[in-house]
């Protein structure tokens, strides 16, 4: 079974799979082709792991488990970031949908060719139960998530139907409760991309921090943050923006000089340190000095910190993500993935050998899942190469 002989001292050594290497060519917010400076899913994951390890060390959790969870958290993301995720969710609707976090679990426990069971069944990396549980960000099946403030059910989920057995073994009847290591991973992810996506946006000239003193721009950012992340407290977000604008190193008029680049990097480091410290202090105040492992407690995020993280994420939404959703490349990216799925349905022999082997053993619904697995495994660049080889010119 998963976890036999897979001690924590070996976890990082296990995590050199092709799925991790491929993250270097997958979109974070800006595509990897944008600039050498811009973060990819791989560099983002390394930064998340660093933050996660700091949280674990300070709170008495197993740092190897948390770090491995952080390195793993984006393995399931397809080409073209969230745009690609939405496209694959559409084409995979008849076989249970697509969700990057459910795909991550599938890679770790099935798809990554590292270990097999005594009967020859693929078991992925054969990680420990604690490590796999720490990767489960959404511990529920499709349609069974928590109810949101507007009364709808969260569209996120952590497992596909055909992976339910291993999911049940991992979760051991815990319901929707998350272990503290998974909470640390999730928070480390939030901290990393809230800070670093803004840093990337400023350096690339997509975020002009000087306009944020305009009350109309402030209202726009707060409204986008509230709408995108479902937050109701606009006043708290406004206060968070005021605090960020008061930072001495805030890049008010960024022109890319050495001094300004250094100041932006220092600001990122200061914000990350502040967020980690505030969370550790609040969590220790609530639960004592630890150690905090598995289900011994919850990570406590002070409201000020939560608002500042959300506001930074909102800046990336307003000035990077929303404008790019109307760009022609977004439609082109979706077309690439739609075309690839269609082409592989028509010609499954074009699948990589291990995917074709899995395809032959499945029924119709299962075969579509295998094709989606194949397409999701591609990088931004290899998706285009496959499209050129299998489909030719982009259709209108």
Residue ranges and their predicted role:
Residues 1, 15-21, 25, 50-51, ...:
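Sequence-structural signature of the catalytic-core scaffold of metal-dependent phosphohydrolases
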Residues 226-366, 378, 390, 396:
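C-terminal subdomains that position terminal phosphate/3'-OH groups for nucleotidyl transfer/ligation
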Residues 372-376, 380:
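C-terminal functional modules
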């Amino acid at each position: 079974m998963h976890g036999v002989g897979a001690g924590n001292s070996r976890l990082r050594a296990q995590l050199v799979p092709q799925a991790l290497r491929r993250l270097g060519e997958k979109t974070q917010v800006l595509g990897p082709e944008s600039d050498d400076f811009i973060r990819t899913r791989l560099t983002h994951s390394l930064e998340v792991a660093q933050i996660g390890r700091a949280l674990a060390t300070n709170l008495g959790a197993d740092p190897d488990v948390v770090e491995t969870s952080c390195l793993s958290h984006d393995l399931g993301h397809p080409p073209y970031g969230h745009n690609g995720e939405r496209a694959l969710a559409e084409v995979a609707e008849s076989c249970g949908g697509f969700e990057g976090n459910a795909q991550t679990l599938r890679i770790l426990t099935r798809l990554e060719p590292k270990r097999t069971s005594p009967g020859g069944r693929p078991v992925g990396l054969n990680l420990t139960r604690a490590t796999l549980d720490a990767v489960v960000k959404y511990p529920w099946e499709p349609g069974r998530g928590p109810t949101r403030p507007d009364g709808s059910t969260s569209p996120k989920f952590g497992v596909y139907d055909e992976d339910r057995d291993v999911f049940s073994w991992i979760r051991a009847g815990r319901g929707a409760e998350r272990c503290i290591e998974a909470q640390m991973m999730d928070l480390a992810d939030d901290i990393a991309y809230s800070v670093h996506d803004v840093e990337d946006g400023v350096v690339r000239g997509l975020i002009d921090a000087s306009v944020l003193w305009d009350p109309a721009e402030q209202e726009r950012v707060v409204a986008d943050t509230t709408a995108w992340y479902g937050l109701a407290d606009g006043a708290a977000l406004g206060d968070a923006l005021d605090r960020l604008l008061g930072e001495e190193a805030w890049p008010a008029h960024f022109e890319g000089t050495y001094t300004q680049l250094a100041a932006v990097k220092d600001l990122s480091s200061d914000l990350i340190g502040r967020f980690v410290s505030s969370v550790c202090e609040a969590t220790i105040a609530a639960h004592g000095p630890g150690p905090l492992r598995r289900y011994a407690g919850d990570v406590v995020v002070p409201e000020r910190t939560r608002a500042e993280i959300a506001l930074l994420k909102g800046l990336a939404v307003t000035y990077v993500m929303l404008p790019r959703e109307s760009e022609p490349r977004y439609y082109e990216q979706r077309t690439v993935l739609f075309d690839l799925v269609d082409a592989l349905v028509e010609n499954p022999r074009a699948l990589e050998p291990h995917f074709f082997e899995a395809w032959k053993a499945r029924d119709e619904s299962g075969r579509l899942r295998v094709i989606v697995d194949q397409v999701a495994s591609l990088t931004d660049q290899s998706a285009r190469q496959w499209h050129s080889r299998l489909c030719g010119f982009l259709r209108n």
